């Protein structure tokens, strides 16, 4: 009689801005799946995101040749009938992850021996990495005989700067006049005890919190 295949759950991991590819019997989803009759006859016939609808996987396909793609929460999985797969993490979907934080994408694949089938999960752990902050140019104005001071998130230089991980963690670390040398801005400072640099028409004092006076 035909014995049912035994499908074993698989796991993998990737950073939020990376791609993983697994091929061959040592790495793909069929590596640890077995069939008492003939394990070499096993193929992947269907794939879906956990909770979603099944998509057929074409016979004879590989991850990079006629493979079937399924979009998860944090990336896209493409899998072949031979069990090979690639997972491309979606940077925009995972941007909210702080460095070191993890989330999972779970996919359910169907294994067939040609007669009967079993299902197993492929769980991809997506790990957040530190994202580069986005700094936006700022402008201000002052009369030639006056002083301006800007403090708080509505006025200082960090107001419109962002970080996908945590904008609240942003701080000013250095300041320099155009064409001049860079000066370090000490951690925890404000404009009142910050770093001063002299420009062509005045002196700017800025703190790590983004507040400044000119």
PLM regions and their residue ranges:
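Acidic/polar, solvent-exposed loop/turn segments
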Residues: 1-213
């Amino acid at each position: 009689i035909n014995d049912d295949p035994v499908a074993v759950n698989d796991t993998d991991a990737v950073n939020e801005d990376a791609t993983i590819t697994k091929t061959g019997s040592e790495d793909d989803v069929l590596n640890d799946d077995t069939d008492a009759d003939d394990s070499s006859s096993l193929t992947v016939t269907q794939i879906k995101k956990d909770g979603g609808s099944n998509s057929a996987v074409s016979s004879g396909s590989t991850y990079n040749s006629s493979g079937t793609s399924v979009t998860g929460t944090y990336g896209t999985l493409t899998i072949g009938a031979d069990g090979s797969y690639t997972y491309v993490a979606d940077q925009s979907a995972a941007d909210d992850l702080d460095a070191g934080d993890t989330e999972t994408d779970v996919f359910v694949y169907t294994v067939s021996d040609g007669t009967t089938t079993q299902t197993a999960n492929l769980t991809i752990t997506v790990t957040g990495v530190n994202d580069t902050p986005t700094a936006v140019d700022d402008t201000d104005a002052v009369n030639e005989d006056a002083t301006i001071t800007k403090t708080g998130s509505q006025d200082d230089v960090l107001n419109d700067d962002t970080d996908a991980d945590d904008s609240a963690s942003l701080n000013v670390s250095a300041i320099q006049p155009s064409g001049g040398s860079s000066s370090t801005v000490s951690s925890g400072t404000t404009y009142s005890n910050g770093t001063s640099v002299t420009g062509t028409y005045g002196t700017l004092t800025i703190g790590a919190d983004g507040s400044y006076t000119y």
